[in-house]
Structures are given as structure tokens and as C-alpha cells.
Amino acid sequence: KRVPLHSSYGDLAAQHVEADEVQLDSSSGTVRLADSSGKRIELRSSYGDVSARHVAGELVAKTSSGDVKVEDLRGATATLTSGYGDVLLDGFQGDLSASTSSGTVAVKGFTGTCELKSSYGDVRAEGRIDRLQARSNSGSVRVRALSGSTLEGDWKLASGYGDVELMVPAGLSFELVAKTGYGSLDVQVPVTVPAGGFKNERKLEGRVGDGGKRIELTTSSGNVRLGTQP
């Protein structure tokens, strides 16, 4: 069963919807979905906020101008996109892609794989992370990887003009590359610099623990900080 709802000039709100496909689309207005489920859920607005709360299914939420807010999502994948606005997620387990051209990307209560990007704004994330790509062209990138996080693939955190900060669980092993063009390095974990490694005030390449997958922390202009938490 497919449930499509469309508005050219007005808000859309729906709840308690159950269908294979759920589609809410507004050309100029907010789009809100709550307490609903579907195999695939698409929420789109050209000019307005998009929100989903207590929703189950593969989610695509997109607005050209407005915020995207998602709370308590249950599904395998989520793609959240804003042209001009914030992207906020609280509560999700799966594969996440969240991006905005101008605004903040903030994720918490998360478990899984995430790719986060803001062209002009900050990136924040907290959760149990397996794979991570986080970037801001002009803003800070700050990630707290909670206990239970693993490196199933390389992690990369980067900023063009801003600070980069990563907190990882104590005891996590990885290869480290940390570098800044104009700023300082603050690495609060023991790093072994083997033959072929590198260390100076703006670049550090080495091994943490037993090594393994790579964590890369880079900024063109800003500070880089790496620390641990219980």
C-alpha cells in the first residue's frame, strides 16, 4: 500500500500511518510525521521544516530551506538533507547520512555508521559509532564516540576552517593521523611513532594501542584535539 500526500501551499501533518510507502510533500510549508511506519518513508518540503517523530522505516527527509528534525527513528537507513537549515537527530540505529549546506548537523542517541557534512556550520555527534565521516568546510567538528564504539572502517573528521575534536573510549586501538595547517595539536592518548611515522607541532602519525583501522583528524585552520572517556 502507498500513501502519498501533497500540498502546494500549506503545511502537512500525519500520524498513525502504516503503509509500504509513505510520501509527504509540500512545495511551501512544514511537513510532519509521527507515530507511523513504512518500508520507505519520504518527507520533502521546498520551503519549510521537516520533522519525524516515533517513526519506523527507511527514511528520506529533505528540505531546500528549513530544519530537518528526527526523533526516535527505527529503520535500517536514514538520509537527512537541508539546503539552508539545521539537521537534528536524536535516537537512531543504522546507516545515517546527514548534511546541510548552511547550518548545524547535530546527532545524538546514535548507533551505527554515519556520514555527516555541513558546508557552513558546525558538526556534532555522540553515540556508539562503527564507521564515521564528518566534515565541515567552515565550522567545528566535535564527536564523542561512546563505549561500545568500534572501528569497522576508517574514521575521518575534517574541517576547512574550524576545530576538530574527537573523544574515544579508553582502550580503543587504531592508527592515527592528526594534522593542522594553522593551529595546535592536543593528543591526550599514548601514541607510538614507528619508523615511517611522523611527529611535530602540527602533524602526528603513529599507532594507538595495537593499531588497526585509521582515524584521521585534519583541519586547515584550527586546533585538533583527541582524548578518551570511560
What are these regions (language model features)?
Residues K1-P230:
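Intrinsically disordered, low-complexity terminal regions
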